[in-house]
A protein has these predicted regions:
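Short, mixed-charge, low-aromatic patches
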Residues: 1-3, 156-160, 302-310
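N-terminal cysteine/histidine-rich coordination modules
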Residues: 1-103, 107-152
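Generic alpha-helix detector with strongest preference for long hydrophobic helices that associate
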Residues: 4, 8-9, 24-28, 87, ...
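Short, exposed beta-strand "edge-strand" segments with a Pro/Gly-rich flavor and a Y/T-containing core
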Residues: 28-35, 184-198, 359-362
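Conserved aromatic-histidine-acidic binding/catalytic patches
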Residues: 31, 94-98, 116, 171, ...
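Hydrophobic, Leu/Ile/Phe/Ala-enriched alpha-helical segments that form helix-helix packing faces
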Residues: 47, 186-187, 355
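Charged, amphipathic alpha-helical linkers/stalks
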Residues: 130-229
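Hydrophobic, aromatic-lined core segments that form the binding pocket/scaffold
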Residues: 193-412
Length: 412
């Protein structure tokens, strides 16, 4: 009997299987596909008649990178596609040589594996259309569960987090599990609107920052318990109702974040289609006055988006929960926990801007459009770490990183 490892994973992973030529996307189109050193050497010495010419001409060493993980890369063809795909968008390397010849990047996508305190966690990126369907359309929400996997399975670990040990005794990371469990439960608390849940997360983060600044991290669990008790009272809902809505500022910031990405280049036709529909749906054309665009935004929201999202709010909830889990929030790759909050608010507000614009363009919304937007948005935005850092910097440099400004970005 094979030895197994325990892995924490969202339940949708059990149902995931690549759908190959039926897929709307090509996994590697317009991406940098890295090759690990072991795979690079296997390709360069392979004598397969069909693949050898491509192995010799379409694979380049990364001479400025000393890492064995990003040792080389595949050179995309003139259409920005992977030269190893056949006419059905299937991988010729897999077909000719088998799964064992795939690089770490190609064998793992769209799976994303981390290690937390010695235990593996695996989720998937929503940039894969099939993952988007499985993860986002589940009305019951994302359920995390422990499964057993073969110890000899090929698993590429992205990175991880250690919350144990004396060196972390006074650091926020020690309370990772308390913070994580609270916030995932918060995002799935349907007694509150999703807007309110994200605002409450910001309130909690500010409390955590204050305790950390005062050297009272040990009080974090008690504070989280107190917030759980407060959320059971109607008084908090009344306070949240008093937060003002400012569509003009919301539009200005969110549009600027979107422009920053579009102007830097977008390698996804599906996302560009969504952007064009968003701009047309909001009347965001050359010479348009901001007040007219704001009026159109509010009109789309009330006519089309509000009705749809009241019934399908779980789609956006599932997206945020998946990102929160996958990115090891509030830590992961972020410099501070507030940076992670700026990120989650930014992607949430950008997705809503697109959907509200698209709802005006199509005179309504349906799941297929919503999935297309979120999947292609994830492909373009979430897969560009430099852009993620740039939007955090833009928000900070503009002076819009306070909780009050974050609430304006969130509130619809």
């Amino acid at each position: 009997m094979n030895e197994t490892l325990t892995m924490l994973t969202p339940s949708y992973m059990k149902g995931f299987k690549c759908i190959g030529p039926k897929c709307e996307e090509s996994c590697c189109y317009a991406w940098n596909v890295d090759l690990d050193k072991k795979t690079y050497k296997k390709y360069k010495t392979n004598q397969n008649e069909k693949l050898r010419p491509l192995f010799q001409t379409m694979i380049n060493r990364r001479h400025n990178n000393k890492s064995d993980v990003n040792y080389a890369k595949i050179k995309m063809d003139s259409n920005k596609g992977c030269p190893f795909l056949d006419e059905n968008k299937l991988c010729n390397i897999h077909k000719e040589l088998g799964e064992g010849y795939l690089s770490n990047t190609c064998s793992s996508y769209p799976r994303y594996t981390r290690q937390v305190d010695g235990m593996l966690e695996q989720s998937a990126t929503i940039s894969c259309p099939e993952v988007a369907r499985l993860a986002l359309l589940n009305k019951e929400g994302i359920i995390l569960e422990h499964i057993e996997v073969d110890k000899n399975s090929r698993i590429s670990i992205n990175n991880g987090l250690n919350t144990e040990g004396y060196l972390l005794a006074n650091r926020l990371e020690k309370y990772f599990w308390d913070i994580r469990i609270f916030n995932i439960s918060l995002l799935q608390n349907r007694n509150y609107s999703l807007d309110d849940r994200v605002i409450i997360m910001g309130i909690v983060y500010k409390k955590i920052e204050k305790l950390n600044h005062e050297g009272n991290n040990r009080d974090i669990p008690a504070m989280l318990n107190a917030m759980n008790d407060l959320m059971k009272e109607d008084s908090l809902k009344e306070q949240l109702k008093g937060i003002p809505k400012n569509t003009a500022i919301q539009m200005k910031i969110t549009k600027e974040l979107t422009d920053k990405k579009v102007l830097s280049g977008v390698g996804s036709e599906r996302y560009l289609e969504c952007v064009i529909e968003t701009l047309n749906g909001l009347g965001f054309i050359e010479g348009a006055k901001l007040e007219d665009v704001v009026e159109k935004y509010d009109d789309n929201y009330n006519k089309y988006f509000k009705t749809y999202i009241e019934e399908k709010q779980y789609i956006l909830e599932n997206y945020l929960v998946n990102e929160y889990f996958r990115e090891l929030m509030p830590f992961g790759s972020f410099n501070t926990i507030w940076d992670s909050y700026i990120y989650i608010v930014s992607i949430y507000s950008m997705i809503k801007l697109h959907l509200i614009g698209m709802s005006g363009y199509h005179h309504g919304l349906e799941d297929e459009l919503t999935l297309k937007l979120i999947q292609s948005f994830s492909r373009v935005v979430v897969h560009t770490p430099s852009y993620i850092q740039s939007i955090i910097k833009l928000i900070k440099d503009s002076g819009f990183d306070s909780l009050a400004h974050m609430s304006i970005l969130i509130k619809s």
